[in-house]
Amino acid sequence: MNTVEVFADILCPFTHVGLHTLIDRRSERGLSQPRLRIRAWPLELVNGQPLDAHHIGAEITALRASVRPDLFDGFSVDTFPSTSMVAFALTAAADRTGDPVLAEEVGMALRNAVFEEGLDIGLS
């Protein structure tokens, strides 16, 4: 199976745009490959603190205005997760199954839950 390996944060709106764009282009061509292997790059740990919902909201406003107006329909600063660690644990479990389709789908489902459905995936 062909794979594109990316390191990405679950709560980063730029990652959401990039991953969706890759999957959209793949689908437009009627392809099921390459699959994305989305590796953990937790900005919460890199930065030493959780991401700020209002800062993310400002980034989303800019992304919708300039790049992908079709994304982020359900985003809400009020339900933005206070942590990404629970979600990263879930993606790690999906990755351990060895099923690349499942791992990609779980990673995208978590991002869609935050950015398209306005869900707080930081609750344990």
Q: Can you describe what each PLM-predicted range is?
A:
Residues 1-5:
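Extreme N-terminal starter segment of soluble prokaryotic enzymes
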Residues 8-11:
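Short pre-active-site segment immediately N-terminal to redox-active cysteine/selenocysteine motifs
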Residues 16-119, 123:
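Structural alpha/beta surface segment adjacent to cysteine/selenocysteine redox centers
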